[in-house]
Amino acid sequence: MDIKASDVKELRDKTGAGMMECKKALQHCNGDAKEAEKYLKEKGLAAVEKRADRVTSEGIIVIKSDHKKAVMLEMTCETDFVAKNADFIAVGEDIAKTAFDKDISEVTPELNDKLLDLATRVRENMNLTRLINVKAGADEYLSRYIHSDKKTGVIIVLKSDKPEIFEKTEVQEFAYDCCLHAAAFMPLYVKKEDVDAAYIKEQEEIFKGQVAELNKPDNVKEGIVKGKISKHLSEICFLEQAFVKDDKLSVSKKMAEVGKEAGGSLSLSKLVIFQLGLGM
């Protein structure tokens, strides 16, 4: 049957499929546009399943938040070209907004379907790999940061015995700076108490091997090893790291200083870091 060019264009605008595919779909469905759209989607889903084994090493991190709640998600695709595509980014923002508005805290079929529709049009394997929903309590303040390349995202929640200090600009700026710090230094742990004892023991043995040949008394060697362990922990633990905007103080000491100057205590309640392909 003859198919109008205007009908083909309308179907293409709706589905994103190629002109010839749209024409064939309309012919297959006897000119019924709704059936043709359904046919293309079903055909597209089959193609998506065939692409499911393809590696998705590119993608973006997306955050939707206010100062009491945040949704952060990771969405992956096959190529950097698609990761930077406006439609891909828009779908990520739409998924984050839906999860935020509906208080969703995990990947659901509803959220997956939003991405699946784009995957059928773009013809690339895509995945909604993880999603987290973080809430701040009445005595807490939430801040967040997304790096410009959209490959690193940070959510931080600070707590105070005087929550009114969170209305102060300097405290809000410090919370944001903590996010910047975490994105820049990518700590492996929040505090040194979180580090597995077996890992510390392993590092200790490595450092003992490094000082074994030194011509020094054993107690001096032990002191050197302890110093190396302390330095290593200060590099991998967020609260022990030298603060990015005042490296004379650790993050924890700077936090205490900012809180005291603002008129209350200040402590870390939660830290979440998403880096594309990794996480904390």
Curated annotation (Swiss-Prot):
Molecular function GO terms recorded: translation elongation factor activity
Pfam families listed in its UniProt record: EF_TS (PF00889)
Protein location: Cytoplasm
GO terms for cellular component: cytoplasm
Entries under InterPro entries matching the protein: EF-Ts_dimer_sf (IPR036402), Transl_elong_EFTs/EF1B (IPR001816), Transl_elong_EFTs/EF1B_dimer (IPR014039), Transl_elong_Ts_CS (IPR018101), UBA-like_sf (IPR009060)
SUPFAM superfamilies membership: Elongation factor Ts (EF-Ts), dimerisation domain (SSF54713), UBA-like (SSF46934)
Keywords of the record: Cytoplasm, Elongation factor, Protein biosynthesis
Its biological purpose: Associates with the EF-Tu.GDP complex and induces the exchange of GDP to GTP. It remains bound to the aminoacyl-tRNA.EF-Tu.GTP complex up to the GTP hydrolysis stage on the ribosome.
PANTHER family membership: ELONGATION FACTOR TS, ELONGATION FACTOR TS, MITOCHONDRIAL
Similarity comment: Belongs to the EF-Ts family.
Name listed for the protein in its UniProt record: Elongation factor Ts
Source taxonomy: Bacteria, Pseudomonadati, Spirochaetota, Spirochaetia, Spirochaetales
